[in-house]
């Protein structure tokens, strides 16, 4: 199946101009012309599989021998429920003024953000049981599993300007309008620009299928954020100048002798725009979002160092191995690392008491299970946006404030690579991940204003986005069914009245706000409804999210032929070694940090909860040594 894949222009998303004072409506979306414009007539590429290969393909193809495209990159997201569009095919609800959904008008996405997600007292409520790494790991996993890129079609720069400056709705521009009393009206005009997500090429005559969005990534936990799901980029990310199986590293700067990611040569660079004096470019990584935030770039840096450490050690054990073998074996181990940390350490403290209900013990690969990431999962996993605190801390070797600016506002660190390269490296940031706490999601304190008003606003020269409004608008863009449809899907009650909804949410104020906005629980956008629910015992999501996340992760695991526990993927001795891996060991092996917590996802206090790196098990690679002739 061929898809339209248009990666967002990062600089365009940064340099927002003042919106014009009038709003005009463009033509209704025309799938025929859009499809012809991007060349949907071209034949789909033919994939040839090697059924005996011990390694995943970069693209995710060939995992399932019977259906090689299952879980592959650049395929449609799966629909667990049919799409719901205003016209039944492609127009999102809220597109046509005055048109209702289930008899009620939809509230503006920004109004929902202001009244439900925002809060006046900006002081965070921190999670007393989860470290900041807990939040960060969720983002790492999300960026390994899904990316539905924007599509910016039409008259190139003119089309984007119409969306950015004039709030012109049409084809792929679906601007987020501001309510009349919104404080952003004074500084940003009438709207925030919003480009609709890329879609799968429809089948002629373009009238039979609803619009389906793309997942540009593989659906497998395979560390594709390190290696890329795109063959040409995967090759660029490697150091092919020597047969050592290494990833390319930065040749211009280092972190006190340790590697940084290479710079991206793409110009203009939003990271250079942030600080025109420092002029530090964005990094090149397996995922295009690696430089969006400094903690994400820090995580990518750890993983590229670990790949090269693994490849180097494997070469020592197996001098006869060539570069391709070393690369693939290190990649295979790092993929297992992501799987193990996610299922052993992360998901149990996300799903809490619902873990065993939705993700039972592993029974082996099942080729009848479809691992494809579902459309709704791309919204369910956004619960992590509510765990992001308003500030980022940098800590010294004694886990005390580092340097003259140890505490930085979150919004100043978007596309901010210079803070890492020229102001301390990654160690102070990693210590902050280990010793500081995530934000706790509270029904009356959902998302920090740093994300709700200042997303991608690292300097005052740039207007900030609203992540909550974007998430809500994206639900409609993707044709997502409403809250109660998903409650029914998960065999949960479907509240219809204020009393019934309050019995689910257990919060009268929030319940009334939601019904005042939406009119009926049936219309509540899935992301909003899901994050509004009280948390399950010992978890960090409500019952609906536990269902959607649990179902997806079970399918990711059971439908993956290369899952680390599947017999034949690793030897028994190799699996015994892999069971000892830990994020703390990753830190010990790839930074100059010497004190780490044993359980890095829990909230930890220094020094009582920290141990020397010598107390943390190392990954024993001796089972990977080939038998000597």
Write out the residue ranges for each language-model feature.
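Terminal regions of secretory-pathway proteins
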Residues: 2-294, 312, 317-629
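Amphipathic, well-ordered alpha-helical segments in soluble domains
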Residues: 306-310
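Alpha-helical bundle segments that constitute or directly flank the non-heme di-iron/ferroxidase center
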Residues: 293-305
């Amino acid at each position: 199946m061929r898809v339209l894949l248009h990666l967002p222009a990062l600089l365009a998303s940064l340099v927002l101009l003042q919106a014009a004072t009038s709003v005009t409506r463009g033509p209704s979306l025309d799938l025929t012309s859009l499809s012809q414009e991007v060349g949907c007539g071209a034949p789909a590429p033919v994939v040839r599989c090697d059924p005996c290969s011990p390694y995943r393909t970069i693209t995710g193809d060939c995992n399932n021998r019977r259906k090689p495209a299952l879980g592959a990159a650049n395929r449609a997201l799966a629909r667990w429920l049919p799409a719901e569009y205003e016209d039944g095919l492609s127009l999102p609800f809220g597109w046509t003024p005055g048109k209702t959904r289930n008899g009620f008008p939809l509230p503006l996405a920004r109004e929902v953000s202001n009244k439900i997600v925002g809060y006046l007292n900006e002081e965070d409520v921190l999670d007393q049981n989860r470290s900041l790494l807990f939040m960060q790991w969720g983002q790492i996993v999300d960026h390994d599993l899904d990316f539905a890129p924007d599509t910016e079609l039409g008259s190139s720069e003119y089309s984007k300007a119409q969306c950015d400056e004039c709030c012109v709705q049409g084809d792929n521009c679906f601007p987020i309008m501001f309510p009349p009393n919104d404080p952003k009206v004074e500084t940003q005009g009438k709207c925030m620009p919003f480009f609709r997500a890329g879609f799968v090429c429809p089948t002629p005559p373009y009238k039979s299928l609803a619009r389906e969005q793309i997942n540009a990534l593989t659906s497998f936990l395979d560390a594709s954020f390190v290696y890329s799901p795109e063959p040409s980029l995967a090759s660029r990310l490697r150091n092919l100048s020597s047969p050592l199986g290494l990833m390319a590293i930065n040749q211009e700067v280092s972190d006190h002798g340790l590697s940084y990611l290479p710079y991206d040569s793409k110009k203009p660079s939003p990271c250079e725009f942030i600080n025109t004096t420092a002029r530090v470019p964005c990094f090149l990584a397996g995922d295009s979002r690696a430089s969006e935030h400094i903690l994400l770039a820090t995580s990518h840096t750890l993983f590229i160092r670990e790949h090269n450490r693994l490849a180097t050690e494997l070469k020592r054990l197996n001098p006869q191995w060539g570069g391709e073998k070393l690369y693939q074996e290190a990649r295979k181990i790092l993929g297992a690392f992501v799987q193990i940390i996610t299922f052993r350490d992360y998901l149990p403290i996300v799903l809490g008491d619902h873990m065993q209900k939705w993700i039972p013990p592993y029974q082996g690969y099942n080729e009848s299970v479809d691992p494809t990431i579902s459309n709704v999962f791309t919204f369910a996993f956004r619960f992590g946006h509510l765990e992001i605190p308003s500030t980022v801390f940098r800590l010294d070797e004694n886990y005390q404030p580092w340097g003259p600016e140890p505490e930085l506002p979150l919004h100043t660190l978007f596309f901010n690579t210079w803070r890492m390269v020229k102001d301390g490296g990654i160690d102070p940031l990693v210590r902050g991940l280990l010793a500081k706490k995530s934000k706790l999601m509270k029904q009356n304190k959902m998302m920090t204003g740093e994300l709700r008003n200042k997303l991608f606003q690292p300097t005052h020269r740039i207007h900030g986005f609203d992540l909550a409004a974007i998430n809500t608008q994206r639900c409609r863009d993707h044709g997502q069914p409403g809250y109660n449809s998903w409650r029914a899907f998960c065999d949960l009650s479907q509240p219809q009245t204020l009393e019934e909804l309050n019995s689910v949410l257990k919060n009268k104020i929030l319940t009334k706000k939601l019904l005042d906005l939406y009119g009926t629980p049936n219309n509540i956008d899935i992301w909003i409804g899901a994050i509004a629910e009280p948390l399950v015992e010992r978890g960090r999501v409500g019952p609906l999210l536990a269902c959607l996340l649990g179902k997806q992760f079970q399918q990711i695991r059971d439908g993956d032929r290369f899952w680390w526990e599947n017999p034949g993927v690793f030897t028994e001795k190799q699996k015994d070694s892999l069971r000892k891996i830990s994020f703390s060991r990753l830190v010990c092996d790839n930074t100059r940090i010497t004190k780490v917590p044993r359980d890095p996802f829990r909230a930890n206090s220094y020094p009582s909860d920290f141990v020397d790196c010598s107390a943390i098990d190392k990954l024993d690679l001796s089972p990977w040594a080939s038998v000597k002739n």
